[in-house]
Each structure stands twice: as C-alpha cells, then as structure tokens.
C-alpha cells in the first residue's frame, strides 16, 4: 500500500462499467493515489473525457462484448471515442486476453480504427498504431524503454512487407532489443528460446 500511495506501484484496475470507473477515480483522489489504466473497459466511451482529464488509459477489446451483464453496453467506436476525448488527449489501448487474439493484435487495432473512421472520427494509422505500442508502454510505466522508435530505447521492432494493419501483410523481420530474431528471407536466423516448442538456446544467446 505504501508503494501505491507513493506512486511506485502503478494501479491497473479491472473495470467494465463507466460509473465504476468514475467511482474508482473519486476514491483515488480521496486517498491521493493514481489509477494508471482501466482494463476490459467496455463502457470507457461513457467517461472518456473524465479518463482524459485524469491521464488514465483504457484497455479495450476491439469488438467483443455482451458475454456477461456488466460487459453488455459497449459500442464499436469505444477505442476511437477514448482516443479522441478532449481534443485527442485520450489514451486508448487495444488488448486481448486471448491466446488467439494476441497473435493478431495489429488486426484488432485495425478493426477498432475502421469502426472509428466509419463513425467520422478520422483515426489515422499513425494514431492507431499507438494503441498497441506506445500507449501500452505508458500504461506499464516503461515508455522510456519501449513503445516507440527513439534513440536509447530497446529497439523492439517489426518490419512488415506492407501496411501493418492489413490482413495481407506479412512479417519480414523481427528485432528484440536490437537483435534480429526472425528474418523471413533467412531461415537460418537463430531462433529465440521457446520452451513450448522445445527450442532452448545456449545461455549467451538468450534474451
């Protein structure tokens, strides 16, 4: 609790409903701590301005809701509304707690971007890419290390052969901490340790 009150521990709050998010922010103000992100924020669009005013991110699915009572009232434009709140100062994150969805998180972001654009929000790809890069890094408190391409950061990078939001684009290269771990044109590229696949590299080659 001391770490929370002193700001050393970032609060990641699981919360579906808009009024519950507002209540949690009131409690945070009362006890002088900060909520960093609301996760599974189905109704974030209802309190998007409040979230933006308080510098709070909302981690949302692109198009999944209705699976239980408190997850009923979402809209397709949820991420776009959060992103564009208060003149575009909102912090939207597209996430997935599914082992399947996480493999195509770029396409999940593309779906949310398309929904926002259909509603007239004019979400640019350069904005939507932040939903799965710099905004999550901000929420985790590691934006000084990852999330964008800047000198001094860890150089985690994917190079695509086309639009990263397209279902037709394929990965050409993957760098982690500046190290080339995948090269489509070079099958001999050393693979990272993956215990599920039984790939175990020597200690000096591990990340």
Q: Can you say where each PLM-predicted feature lies in the sequence?
A:
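Extracellular/periplasmic ectodomains of large secreted or surface enzymes and adhesion receptors
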Residues: 176-207
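Small/polar (Gly/Ser/Thr/Ala-rich) solvent-exposed segments
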Residues: 164
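Distinct, well-ordered alpha-helical segments
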Residues: 21-28, 47-52, 109
């Amino acid at each position: 609790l001391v770490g929370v009150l002193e700001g050393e521990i970032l609060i990641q709050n699981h919360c579906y409903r808009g009024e519950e998010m507002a209540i949690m922010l009131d409690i945070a103000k009362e006890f002088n701590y900060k909520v960093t992100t609301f996760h599974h924020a189905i109704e974030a669009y209802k309190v998007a301005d409040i979230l933006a005013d308080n510098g709070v991110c909302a981690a949302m699915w692109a198009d999944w809701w209705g699976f239980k009572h408190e997850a009923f009232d979402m809209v397709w434009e949820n991420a776009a509304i959060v992103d564009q709140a208060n003149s575009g100062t909102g912090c939207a994150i597209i996430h997935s707690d599914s082992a399947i969805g996480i493999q195509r998180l770029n396409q999940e972001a593309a779906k949310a971007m398309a929904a926002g654009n259909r509603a007239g929000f004019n979400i640019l790809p350069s904005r939507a890419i932040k939903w799965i890069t710099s905004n999550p890094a901000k929420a985790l408190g590691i934006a000084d290390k990852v999330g964008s391409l800047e000198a001094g950061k860890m150089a985690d990078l994917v190079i695509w052969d086309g639009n990263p939001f397209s279902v037709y684009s394929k990965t050409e290269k993957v760098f982690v901490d500046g190290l080339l771990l995948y090269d489509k044109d070079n099958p001999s590229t050393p693979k990272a340790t993956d215990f599920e696949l039984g790939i175990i590299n020597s200690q000096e080659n591990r990340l």
